[in-house]
């Protein structure tokens, strides 16, 4: 009876253990299993492994889904392709967090999904380090890359880099948590690249993986020709082994047929920097207690040097030997039977990894979290994927970072100019504690300038121009600015108080609104009286009542009389220029220099252009667009009064009508100013506006050679739901006019971009738009393309009058922007935000490069 009870307890314990193992085997809490390219939100359970796969839609922001018609394995039937961007990234956030070890596996099958019959080649990155290069030799080949990785942060970035040798893609991405024992698969650099993993037995049967292997390691059957398989039907335990080997793998072993022969294996190593990490797994599968006088004992050696002597595997228990040989051209492993052994050596399983340097730390965690938060809160539409600062060739657009081999990279500069930011200035900026330059200009930011910006002790440039910020500026920022050690740019924020004195004490807060109310009432009464006097005077100034434009009733702009215009221009004494609309005169209004555009009576299109320009200028306000001061319309006399630009227009400068030749830096700044004005028309106006007459003569310069886009006589609004054509009336200036508008009989924002591309080419070359000879007419774009094709040297197209104090790479960048803008394929033309970013980067390059 006692014997029966004992057996019952044994079987009960064994059954309970089996239940525990089964539950653990089914636990996928440490798994992230992604079938790339399947429909968003979808998932399924694999019939063979029982692994739950999900769509990649919540792990990646870019790419397009593609499918392969004929493939057996379900995880290879779909893929995600990345035709755009130099780097695209998946973000994995395992629940176990950072400082843990994970097995990460990426799989690829080309399957000629794109019909190109190509051999795509691209780079694979993990965090800020190169993982491997993926090369698909044909459509049916399957490539799998695997790494054991010690995570540095909560987020794990797996990225694909475009090498220009085919479109990157990925079929499957898998992550497996390897338990809490970080001594398992230990590596000095935090990463082990998979080389091979063998289940040493006969070649019959399939690879072993989950749920037989709790970590979903894939074990490939392998047998040496001089060996045979031995096995057991009993389970092999790994209770005291942190590698948690599969019982199915460990229940088979390989042993030499010739019992006196050793087991040998050789690794060829052509790279002296490569270090192999070898894991040999042993378990005795024969019950030697049933074989009297039989023993199994052997030595383990590397290149003839014994590293483990007299080793005897334990029956049905896993033992692992970790071997880390010195790097040599040939590494020979041997399992040699000892003299007292009666049985040959055995080995059950083998893993080989390569230890490579993952020496580059990720971007400082606080910095990375800050810009990631900004990306989310402002919905930043930039190619911001993966680690912000790494690898260096893939740094996030608009960022600069500092690099130190001993510490993680830090973000030192952030340019979010013209990025469509709205709302308040985010507190996340306060976490960029090493930031030196911050540009938030040309956005829609509102509210106060927060005090925390003054606490960023390394900040030396802060640009907040052209937003809608209100309130007073923190006194510390103003004080730092006054010392000259800090550049603070606050222009074009009408509601912003920039004087220290405007920060009043609390005792005055109740007085100010009361005084302001009385003052406002007084001003209102005064203006009413002035308005009545002006109206009576205007009614008497001409015999017939003036035809007041309907726009004057709806827009709060000053309507002048023709008599006022005669006075301010000194009876039209100084002509500034002439055009199809009429003549522009110089004048003064309240000691302010103005330009008066008088519409010609003979201009057939004049009144339409006049009305269009007034409609545009009374509703758009931007630092890079000419500002309307007023207008007049009496009888046949009509015109505009706008701010005077002292340095004329860009066309005259390029034509050599001024003594000073503009430098490349000045031209870049002018191009950027004009681009920002055009970007505002396209992206900042509701509804958007197409200019339709972008040219160098419509880019005006002030005394500091800062530019504003002018002449909106041909401008038209267009609606976002039907932007393909704005107007069926083709208008503009030959040479700048998009040739495709005659095919489509319409103009749109891409037509403006074509014109701006021509402007850029003029600025680069100093050439006229069209060069005419007796035999032909050559457009500047055709000339540039011809020269670059024949010489591939951008210096051959640069304006010879310009000083050679420039970075040739920035010129190349602008040439590329210009040529893409004038592309005959409209879809290849960039939009204005892209052009603005490109010009901004070029200007920053010029300003930071002091050693030409």
Swiss-Prot record:
Residues recorded with modification Phosphoserine: 697, 727
Residues found modified as Phosphotyrosine: 642
Main location: membrane
GO molecular function: ATP binding; protein serine kinase activity; protein serine/threonine kinase activity
The protein, known as: Probable LRR receptor-like serine/threonine-protein kinase At1g05700
Source organism of the structure: Arabidopsis thaliana (Mouse-ear cress)
EC number: 2.7.11.1
Protein kinase domain ranges (all copies): 570-843
Residues with attached carbohydrate: 138, 182, 231, 240, 258, 293, 400, 415, 431, 466
Catalytic site: 693 (proton acceptor)
Residue list for modification Phosphothreonine: 561, 728, 733
GO cellular component: membrane
Record family assignment: Belongs to the protein kinase superfamily. Ser/Thr protein kinase family.
Lineage of the organism: Eukaryota, Viridiplantae, Streptophyta, Embryophyta, Tracheophyta
Signal peptide (UniProt feature, chain positions): 1-25
UniProt entry keywords in alphabetical sequence: ATP-binding, Glycoprotein, Kinase, Leucine-rich repeat, Membrane, Nucleotide-binding, Phosphoprotein, Receptor, Repeat, Serine/threonine-protein kinase, Signal, Transferase, Transmembrane, Transmembrane helix
Topology of this chain in the membrane: Single-pass type I membrane protein
SMART domains membership: S_TKc
Side Cytoplasmic, residues: 532-852
Catalytic activity: L-seryl-[protein] + ATP = O-phospho-L-seryl-[protein] + ADP + H(+); L-threonyl-[protein] + ATP = O-phospho-L-threonyl-[protein] + ADP + H(+)
Stretches in topological domain Extracellular: 26-510
